[in-house]
Regions:
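Aromatic-acidic/polar surface patches that form glycan- and anion
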Residues: 1, 27, 109, 113, ...
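Structured beta-strand-rich core segments of catalytic domains in phosphoester-bond hydrolases
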Residues: 1, 5, 19, 23-98, ...
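Active-site beta-strand/loop signature of hydrolases that rely on acidic residues for catalysis
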Residues: 8-31, 89, 100-104, 120-146, ...
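Active site of divalent-metal-dependent phosphoester/diester hydrolases
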Residues: 30-31, 44-63, 80-83, 128, ...
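Surface-exposed cleft-lining segments at the edges of enzyme active sites
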Residues: 73-77, 103-111
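Alpha-helical scaffold elements lining the catalytic groove of polysaccharide deacetylases
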Residues: 112-122
Length: 204
């Protein structure tokens, strides 16, 4: 049995994270305006991007932040089947420092994901400030450029922790720029969706 939106809000309130990245959210009347409801109840800044707009649904990604959002963009990734994309959100974290948050959802097809991952890597290479890349990669044993990405789970020996109950692999990731230190990583076995939530503490 899936939780209600109120269950998810309660969980997120308890975690009290500075940033929250969600995938497969639906900002439509029939879904209870999930994005707006979460924004109001959590009292956070938000950035939403719909990858799919059809049949009364606005279906995509949302990033919430306790810090004011400096800039934002929604970027479509190359997709042959269902449209996939990523949100790029820039927040100011103090002392003139910026942080890039990239929230993404990759495709189900292996060849399609290879192209999408390369697009994300090429995008990240252009960034001048620290970055966090999070989301549903739909792939275990992810092959990525280790010169520009550090896997938060691997950094604290949690790489065998599953994030999706129906898979034997970890398919959700938090990747950070090399200079970011991973202090904590956990996957609470909470029934918040078909994926488990990931919680991490970073030193930037």
């Amino acid at each position: 049995m899936f939780p209600t939106l109120f269950d998810i809000i309660d969980f997120l309130r308890i975690e009290n994270a500075d940033f929250i990245c969600l995938q497969e959210v639906n900002e439509s009347a029939k879904a209870g305006f999930q994005v707006s409801s979460l924004k109001e109840d959590l009292n956070m800044y938000s950035h939403f991007g719909a990858n799919v707009v059809a049949l009364g649904s606005n279906y995509g990604l949302v990033t919430y932040s306790k810090y004011k959002i400096k800039s934002q963009e929604h970027i479509y990734l190359s997709s042959e089947k269902e449209q996939r994309g990523m949100l790029h959100t820039v927040v100011k974290i103090g002392f003139g420092r910026n942080l890039n948050i990239i929230n993404l959802h990759l495709g189900l097809d292996k060849d399609e994901r290879k192209v999408q991952i390369k697009e994300v890597e090429n995008f990240v290479k252009k960034l001048k400030d620290p970055y966090i890349v999070v989301g549903d990669f739909n792939q275990g044993n992810l092959d990525f450029n280790k010169e520009i990405f550090k896997d938060a789970a691997v950094s604290v020996n949690k790489n065998n922790t599953l994030t999706f109950g129906a898979s034997l692999d970890r398919i959700d990731y938090i990747l950070v720029s090399p200079e970011i230190e991973v202090k904590y990583y956990d996957v609470p076995m909470k029934n918040m969706s078909d994926h488990y939530p990931i919680v991490t503490k970073l030193k930037i």
